[in-house]
From Swiss-Prot:
Gene3D superfamilies: Urocanase like domains (3.40.50.10730), Urocanase superfamily (3.40.1770.10). Pathway: Amino-acid degradation; L-histidine degradation into L-glutamate; N-formimidoyl-L-glutamate from L-histidine: step 2/3. Binds 1 NAD(+) per subunit. NCBIfam families: hutU, PRK05414.1. Its EC number is 4.2.1.49. This is Urocanate hydratase. The active site is at C407. NAD(+) binds at residues 49-50, 127, 173-175, 193, 239-240, 260-264, 270-271, 319, 489. It is found in: Cytoplasm.
């Protein structure tokens, strides 16, 4: 992959570079994904998650930019794995962009075949929000992480993480949310990363409090704050596959244990034991097969240590990076003895159509986001947990790139909020249109048997019709851009998922599209969980009037 040293930053204000606000939104969000404040390796078009890219290569990036600048408001741009391949006449209520990233026929859906295609320039890895142009930096996963640790606290620690120690690893674009999510819940956390730059970035953005290269110092500080029942986050430089076994050897057992290293990609994401970053890069280039094998062996040691901590009483869970599957394939037959975070903590929210709803101020003015914060505090005042989140986010979350906010809203709530935002754009309360989107990790848009759809009640973990239906209904209902991806979060062969974005530009046409899309999108989450037999989803569907023909 050619590296290009250029600083990309989304335009701000109300002057259009394109022929309409929806096209402008797509252009600005593509560029925002590659803003140095947002992207992990913008010079390689990598946004987050190992090699999750916004475009296939620099030539394709420029062609997408040029296409969006000339795209008419009754045309649709098609993007195949980060490359613009067609512009067709459609209609004004159709999506302006349709994206399909990293999709492979199941028999060939593995990293080896993907890498062959990538080497030939035929495919890119889109992760979830990298290739769908709606990544907003670490805040994008922060509330979900906050909710996960909050639910763990409710289930196991009387509602708070005060006086507890969490041990985790991985401080990249996704995992970087963990330190702040734990301290927001009152806890102490040691977060390990092998890359000093990742820790420095989290400290710079106020997601992590301190840095150390010493395990002794990390443990001393952690124990001091744990005894005081005060929160602190400690970024520890090191390899988790070395540090966790060492803690087991010393008989040190944290209260919670999880992991968000880039284990989904053994070649580009995980660093084997005993290698510096430079040595790992050299081996990756010279002998990728050996590199992958060493990575898998290290992951197995990593999971063995997590299991040992679980046996000693630690609340242990997989945070969706497929590390258990790798260890299992390497012969660790009890790798799945600790659960994934969705069945352990998040699924009840999915049953209510809740998920990581986000919005971005195209103006670039933080005041536009602060005004929308006030809408949440006013319109959803009865949801104290949500309002607490908004207040904490305002105080503690630093914007990356265009100002944005995330919060988990459910069926009915998303459409209500979207209507209000569109009205605020229409009457000038907000200085420019707002982009509304979400992660692919949502209630009705993903099939991922080792993550979002793990341990479904009816055994339908691997049924991938649901994300396809989600993308289809969002497209016909007028989402601004819609994406269908493969392999996000957990790697090739293990997930299919869909994304959508809708632009609130203040027009009456946008109001109608918003109503349709922000109803059907979370509605798919309710439907999917009703179909799987979840009572809470059935209650939600009946209460909200979701029309499900065979619901009993």
């Amino acid at each position: 992959m050619e590296k290009v040293q250029q600083t990309i930053r989304a335009p701000r204000g109300t002057e259009l570079q394109t022929k309409g606000w929806v096209q402008e939104a797509a252009l600005r969000m593509l560029m925002n994904n590659l803003d140095p404040e947002v992207a992990e390796k913008p010079e390689e078009l990598v946004v987050y998650g190992g090699i999750g890219r916004a475009a296939r290569n620099w030539e394709s990036y420029q062609a997408i930019v040029d296409s969006l600048k000339t795209l008419e408001s009754d045309e649709t741009l098609l993007v195949q794995s980060g490359k613009p391949v067609a512009i067709f006449k459609s209609h004004e209520d159709a999506p302006r962009v349709l994206l399909a990233n990293s999709n492979l026929v199941p028999k060939w859906a593995n990293w080896d075949h993907f890498r062959e295609l990538e080497k030939k320039g035929l495919m890119m890895y889109g992760q979830m929000t990298a290739g769908s142009w709606i990544y907003i930096g670490t805040q994008g996963i922060l509330q979900g992480t906050y909710e996960t640790f909050g639910e763990a606290a409710r289930q196991h620690f009387d509602g708070s993480l005060k006086g507890t120690l969490t041990l985790t690893a991985g401080l990249g674009g996704m995992g970087g949310a963990q330190p702040l999510a734990v301290t927001m819940n009152g806890g102490v956390v040691i977060a390990i990363d092998v890359d000093k730059r990742s820790i420095d970035r989290r400290i710079e953005k106020r997601y992590c409090d301190m840095y150390t290269e010493s395990l002794e110092e990390a443990l001393t500080v952690a124990n001091e704050y744990k005894e005081k029942r005060e929160p602190i986050s400690i970024g520890l430089l090191g390899n988790a596959a070395e540090i966790l076994p060492e803690l087991v050897k010393r008989n040190i057992t944290p209260d919670l244990v999880t992991d968000q290293t880039s284990a989904h990609d053994p070649l580009n994401g995980y660093i084997p034991v005993g290698y510096t970053l430079e040595e790992a890069a050299k081996l990756r280039e010279e002998d990728p097969e050996r590199y992958v094998q060493l990575s898998k062996e290290s992951m197995t040691k990593h999971v063995e240590a997590m299991l040992a901590m679980q046996e000693k009483g630690a609340i242990t869970f997989d945070y969706g990076n497929n590390i258990r599957q790798v260890a299992f394939d390497e012969g660790l037959k009890n790798a799945f003895d600790f659960p994934g975070f969705v069945p352990a903590f998040i699924r009840p929210l999915f049953c209510e159509g809740k998920g990581p709803f986000r919005w971005v101020a195209l103006s670039g003015d933080p005041e536009d986001i602060y005004k929308t914060d006030e809408v949440i505090l006013r319109e959803f005042a009865d949801n104290e947990h949500l309002c607490n989140w908004i207040r904490m986010a305002r105080q503690q979350v630093e914007f990356q790139g265009l100002p944005s906010r995330i919060c988990w809203l459910g069926y009915g709530e998303r459409a209500k909020f979207g209507r209000i935002i569109n009205e605020m754009v229409a009457n000038g309360e907000l200085s420019a249109p707002i982009v509304i989107g979400r992660d692919h990790l949502d209630c009705g848009s993903v099939a991922s048997p080792n993550r979002e759809t793990e341990a479904m009640k009816d055994g339908s973990d691997a049924v991938a019709d649901w994300p396809i239906l989600n993308a289809l209904i969002n497209s016909v209902n007028g989402a601004s851009w819609v994406s269908v991806h493969h392999g996000g979060g957990v790697g090739m062969g293990y997930s299919l998922h869909a994304g959508m974005v809708i632009v609130a530009d203040g027009t009456e046409a946008a109001a109608k599209r918003i109503e349709r899309v922000l109803t059907s999108d979370p509605g798919m989450g309710v439907v999917r969980h009703v179909d799987a037999g979840y009572d809470l989803a059935v209650e939600t569907a009946k209460e909200k009037g979701v029309n499900i023909p065979m619901m009993k």
